[in-house]
Amino acid sequence: MSTKSHYRREDIKSGNIAFSPSRTTIETAFYGNNVETITDLKLAYEMAKNTKGTVVTDMPVYMPEKSGLPEDAKVLLFNDGEIVGRFAGARVILGEPAADEGEITKVLREAAYFTRYKKMYHTSAYIGLDTDFMIKANLLIPETYENTLYNWLLNFQILTPFYDEMYKKSKPVGDEPDIYILSDPDYYHPNYPNGLAYFDPEHNCACLLGMRYFGEHKKGTLTIAWGVANRNGYTSCHGGLKRMVKDNGEAYVMGVFGLSGSGKSTLTHAKHGGKYDVTVLHDDAYVISNKDGTSVALEPSYFDKTQDYPLTDGNNKYLITVQNCGITLDSDGKKVIVTEDIRNGNGRAIKSKLWAANRVDKMEDPINAIFWLMKDASLPPVIKLDDPVVASIMGACLATKRTTAERLAEGVDMNALVFEPYANPFRTYPLSEDYEKFKSLFESGVDCYILNTGQFINKNIPKEVTIGIIESIVDGTAKFTSLGKLEDIKTTDVEGFIPDFRDKNYVDVIDVSMKKRIEFVDSLQVAKGGRDNLPDEAVNALHLLLLRIKSL
């Protein structure tokens, strides 16, 4: 699929989805005489390299020509200041009860007006890397934020002759217009002193004000793209997907869903000691066709944490840019990065597409299984869910803990158990639509598992245990038995992590965990005016599950 860039004059009128107060205000700013269009990645690199505050390291980019960069390209570092994570409190989504377009467009008009005092850069990229799903996106950002522009072009697919030709072959779907995003990290409106991330999902536009952190631009773009996918027969996925082929040629395609820090990147890129022929689609953003189960990656590169990668780690070979990390001099006087979150939390880097040796942009094999990654001390390391309703509702109650990738409001407990439906805090449409999409996949034969990547009771679950569980599932050697007396909820014994239903204390722990899920689902009936309320069958399934747990 593709989106629409141009319109016949007779179609430029009220009633066309490409023209609304928000979108027209945002798009108009792109055409000012203070706007310079940047379409060349090598130029974007030079601009980022030369902007004030950039640290040009002495670390060469690996095979830079493969990424469209100069042959002498170096890893660039740029730091943002105090804020080093996304701020959910800044998000305003048109269509939700709290969003008043009349008031918001006043803010947009002011922000657009003040761009006249700055030189602005306009660039474009494709979101989606196959003719099945491609969206054209446009970003407008001020001079001095060349690193953000450069990172955005690296994170998504810059327009090249190869991808331009692919895009031409994509079939336009409906009247979906191109994405337009206006960003001014230096502009703060009095109504939004902590910044504004505004989304008009039906008209494919957004405005980011007071947002320096690159993750806001990455996820802001994906927020709109996932909405387009949802409207056009795809399940939007914030997670990783890979294929593992056994020696007998049998392929197993698995998707893992979790927030930053859940292990989704680690599990997606795990090599399994060469036991399988592993092919990676992506570790963060893709879409699954509800028609045939195939998947398309939305991004070519990887925006990864640097916390687990000390300087000499081999994975750092694939770095292109680094954000919110330190710099020091090595024994040869060379400028090198300081990682492991020594400087601050949530250090980040963009890694090239080459990081995954076997990478594809479309997974032709249909997906076999979905794994919800949770951090819930009541759960054993793995659970298998056979009922499509229970499988989908448990994804809607995906339990985790907050991470350094987020900027939290004052007073929020970092260690509290929270629920993030389908590990996707970037949804702009009613939650019930994701519930139905995932349920449809499970009804079509896709298996569902929960992997607890945190603690079981008070014992950490090592990543090696989790990877071993995945391998036993792929190999067909995992022996699942009923979890207690819950026949359609199964587990497999993992030494040191076996739930004891004779222990009243343990039963109480899992009882409390399920009650919290019910409280969360019940709260959706009120939050956002009930916009994210789930179907009765889902709510009833949770209540029934709680009753069954009480009877154990």
Describe the predicted segments one by one.
Residues 1-163:
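N-terminal accessory targeting/assembly segments
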Residues 2-73, 78-80, 325-552:
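Conserved NTP phosphate-binding and transfer environment spanning the P-loop NTPase/kinase superfamily
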Residues 253-255, 271, 292-307, 460-478:
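Conserved, well-ordered active-site substructure
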Residues 202, 233-251:
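Phosphate-binding P-loop
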Residues 277-349:
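Conserved nucleotide-sensing/catalytic segment adjacent to the nucleotide-binding pocket
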Residues 128, 212-215, 247-249, 261-262, ...:
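Short, glycine-/Ser/Thr-/acidic-enriched flexible segments
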Residues 175-232, 236:
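Charged, amphipathic alpha-helical linker segments immediately N-terminal to NTP-binding catalytic cores
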Residues 244-275, 280:
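Glycine-rich phosphate-binding P-loop
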